[in-house]
């Protein structure tokens, strides 16, 4: 039998405590010592009916409770509702409301809540339950007086009540009606910032953006520096699809109120979403100053430092995360392995990867060790390690096939890499990951026809796969004369992932191929500012050279090549234009 959520003895002691118990000829008064520790409902004695507990009422109480214990909820609801009507006891009506809500019987719950509110008109809890049930049943006009009464009697809790209105009203489908109701409820409180906040949030839900902005601004004016109002205003601005405007607002707010940590955290995350990594790291570092032992913020700064190739800082922050008791230490060890691998410190990377003992990163860490073995001219050892790893599901089979193909691609054995991926597709049919990787191998084999076929299949399988559109568009721009088609594909990728620096780079490259040099320079400069990648530097230099800015192009290539001496794209650009 499933354990009921309705405690049996505690309910009866609460209900029977103040009344005379009569069973046959015997009667006795329950004392406080007979009750357990369950607190009494807050019911004024003035609202308790002066009645004795008859055998019939006692039987019904027992029946209702035992029915609830045995999950016969309809019987329990009906019995409690009968008792609520006949006894006039608000505690019984409260119980009837609770059981009816749990039983998902809105009609009975609403009737019980009405009785409860009538029987104990001073009860805020009764009003809250009744108003919530009325809202859930779409009866906003009937709920309004109860909500008004709750607010008028709340005293210092009026502000918090306005802040909770959204959760109460969110379930109602007619958002315009909710916005109108909140406007009416807020009118008597022209100086209360929470009232303006509630109006702004309801207007936002209703799509009334101008009204939402105005109300959020009013909330800020009534309580300057209030972070909740600022965050809501930023959320409203985000509906305008203008990330720069949102960033500008948060930046201005933080200039005025630099201690606003909640706003700074949202701003930092927004910068990460927009791929503005240097600015994001700066904000997370400011957050970290106020909470230096927070492992999540420390990890964020470490990963952003790694993204920006500030390896020394990344090492310091990631090592610190391990000392702060981070909940997923193997994840941090994996990141440290990546950090050393990016610096071609194979021994250091293998040491960190080898310390990953469990979790999602276990197989991934061994795959990275295999890749590093291959890069040290130990290809067969690397492949043997991969083949020894367990593949317990489709995801792991996919990852292992990808890793094996990567080893072969790294030594330019593209045909065998193609074969491995094709074999993987027989095991995991229609894997968009394997199809995408096979397309990249096809490009190395100069088989643009195979690349296009695989990428179009990826797009068919996953229409939101931004990188498939980007890869196909870039290849068509770089390797064919199908520039208009390439532009259309890349614009689709930009729409799906507007802040991705590599997709922005592709857009700049197709603009260059179309002869739109000014557009190309602006776009590629944006991409490079977001991510100073060597291939982006190579493309931007090509555009600068074509514009006659040969010295600027050469300086850019040389600086980027110094930081990325293994870049084939930069080496080719320098050899072509400076020798």
Residue ranges and their predicted role:
Residues 25-40:
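Cleaved targeting-peptide boundary
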Residues 12-22:
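Bacterial N-terminal signal peptides
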Residues 2-12:
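Bacterial N-terminal signal peptides that target proteins for export
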Residues 30, 45-72, 76-579:
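Alpha-solenoid helical repeat scaffolds
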């Amino acid at each position: 039998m499933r354990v009921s959520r309705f405690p049996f003895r505690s309910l009866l002691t609460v209900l029977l405590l103040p009344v005379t118990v009569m069973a046959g000829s015997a009667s006795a008064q329950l004392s406080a010592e007979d009750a357990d520790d369950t607190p009494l409902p807050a019911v004024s004695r003035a609202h308790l009916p002066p009645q004795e507990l008859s055998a019939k009422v006692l039987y019904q109480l027992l029946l209702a409770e035992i029915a609830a214990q045995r999950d016969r909820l309809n019987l329990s609801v009906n019995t409690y509702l009968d008792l609520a009507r006949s006894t006039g006891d608000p505690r019984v009506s409260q119980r009837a409301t609770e059981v009816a809500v749990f039983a998902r019987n809105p009609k009975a719950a609403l009737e019980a809540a009405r009785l409860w509110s009538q029987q104990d008109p001073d009860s805020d809890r009764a009003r809250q339950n009744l108003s919530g049930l009325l809202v859930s049943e779409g009866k906003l006009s009937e709920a309004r007086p109860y909500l008004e009464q709750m607010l008028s009697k709340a005293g210092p809790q009026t502000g918090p009540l306005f802040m909770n209105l959204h959760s109460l009203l969110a379930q109602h489908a007619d958002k315009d009606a909710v916005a109108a109701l909140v406007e009416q409820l807020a009118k008597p409180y022209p100086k209360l910032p929470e009232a303006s906040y509630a109006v702004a949030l309801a207007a936002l839900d209703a799509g009334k953006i101008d009204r939402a902005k105005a109300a959020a601004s009013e909330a800020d004016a009534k309580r300057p520096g209030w972070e909740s109002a600022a965050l809501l205003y930023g959320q409203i601005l985000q509906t305008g699809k203008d990330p720069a405007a949102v960033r500008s607002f948060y930046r201005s707010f933080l200039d005025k109120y630099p201690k606003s940590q909640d706003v700074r955290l949202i701003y930092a995350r927004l910068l990460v979403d927009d791929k503005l990594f240097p600015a994001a790291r700066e904000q997370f570092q400011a957050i970290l100053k106020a909470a230096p032992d927070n492992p999540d913020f420390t990890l964020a700064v470490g990963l952003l430092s790694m993204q920006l190739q500030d390896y020394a800082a990344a090492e310091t922050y990631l090592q610190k995360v391990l000392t702060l008791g981070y909940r997923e230490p193997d994840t941090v060890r994996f990141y440290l392995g990546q950090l050393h691998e990016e610096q071609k410190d194979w021994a250091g990377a293998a040491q960190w990867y080898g310390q990953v003992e469990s979790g999602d990163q276990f197989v991934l860490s061994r795959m990275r060790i295999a890749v590093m073995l291959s890069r040290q001219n130990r290809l067969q050892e690397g492949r043997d390690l991969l083949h020894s790893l367990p593949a317990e599901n489709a995801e792991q089979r996919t990852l292992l096939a990808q890793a094996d193909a990567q080893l072969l691609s790294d030594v330019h054995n593209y045909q065998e890499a193609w074969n491995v991926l094709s074999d993987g597709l027989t095991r995991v049919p229609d894997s968009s990951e394997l199809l995408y990787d096979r397309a990249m191998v096809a490009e190395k084999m100069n088989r643009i026809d195979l690349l296009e076929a695989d990428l179009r299949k990826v797009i068919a399988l996953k229409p939101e796969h931004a990188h498939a559109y980007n890869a196909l568009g870039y290849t068509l721009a770089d390797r064919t004369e199908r520039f208009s088609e390439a532009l259309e594909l890349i614009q689709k990728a930009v729409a799906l992932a507007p802040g991705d620096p590599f997709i922005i780079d592709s857009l700049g490259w197709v603009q260059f191929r179309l002869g739109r040099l000014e557009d190309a320079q602006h776009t590629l400069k944006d991409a490079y500012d977001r991510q100073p990648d060597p291939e982006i530097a190579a493309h931007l230099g090509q555009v600068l050279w074509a514009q006659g800015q040969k010295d600027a192009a050469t300086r850019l290539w040389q600086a980027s090549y110094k930081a990325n001496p293994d870049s084939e794209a930069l080496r080719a650009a320098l050899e072509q234009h400076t020798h």
